[in-house]
Amino acid sequence: MTIELKENERLDDLQRNGLQIIQKTDGFCFGMDAVLLSGFAAVKPGERVLDLGTGTGIIPLLLSAKTEGEHFSALEIQDEIARMAERSVKLNHLENKIEIVHGDIKEASRIFGAASFDVVTTNPPYMNDSHGLKNPTEVKAISRHEVLCTLEDVVREGAKVLKPGGRMYMVHRPHRLIEILGTMKQYKLEPKRMKLVHPFRDKDANMVLIEAVRGGGAWMKVEAPVIVYKEPGVYTCLLYTSPSPRDSTSS
């Protein structure tokens, strides 16, 4: 299927099952965080998945290629970005497997219904301080800062739409780890797995991947860390099989 690209759009190869994605040329592109989250999330055959704050739709696209999940829903509040993600789904002939929904994360349980999903994935805005933003409605500001939703909104709605025993997978920043774990426990999501991500072996972690289970028992495994680069510009072996992000913008 041919898709006409709009102004400031480009087509990128995801290097997986021939999939392609439409992205903005002016910087709104998927980042390493989305790639790592799609690799960390475990989706079993027949499971239904919801991606909260899907942006370009990168996470459901990657998960549809690497897992045997039955269906992937994806929620995005920005209409233009949601429509762009929908065009990527059509481009890849995945309309029967991936559904892009334009809507607010804070309304996710109303939109989809309680206990509707086996898995929730989310790459939410990392920054909770919007000080200095020139225009809080800009695409990048919304994806990076808690302008339209908070960490608590994401966790609360994720917990509501998960079935008992369902799993949430989140990528976030280590400086908010205590807040993340506390909020998850507040909404009966028990953290079960955690993996820190370091840009280089000798650098501090700059991302954290977390799996939490709705109603799970109090026991968590801290897994071996991910090291992204072996040297500047050269990915470690772990990442050679993953799509390469064009920049570090969250999606």
Regions found by a protein language model. Give the residues of each.
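Class I SAM-dependent transferase core
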Residues: 2-44
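General small-molecule cofactor/ligand-binding pocket signal
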Residues: 22, 99-101, 192-195
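Mobile active-site "lid"/loop adjacent to the S-adenosyl-L-methionine
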Residues: 124-153
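Conserved SAM/SAH cofactor-binding pocket of Class I
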Residues: 42-122, 127-133
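Residue-level signal for inorganic ion chemistry
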Residues: 37, 123, 154, 212
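Conserved small/polar residues in nucleotide/adenosyl-binding loops
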Residues: 240-245
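Class I S-adenosyl-L-methionine
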Residues: 190-234
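Conserved Class I SAM-dependent methyltransferase catalytic core
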Residues: 148-198, 205
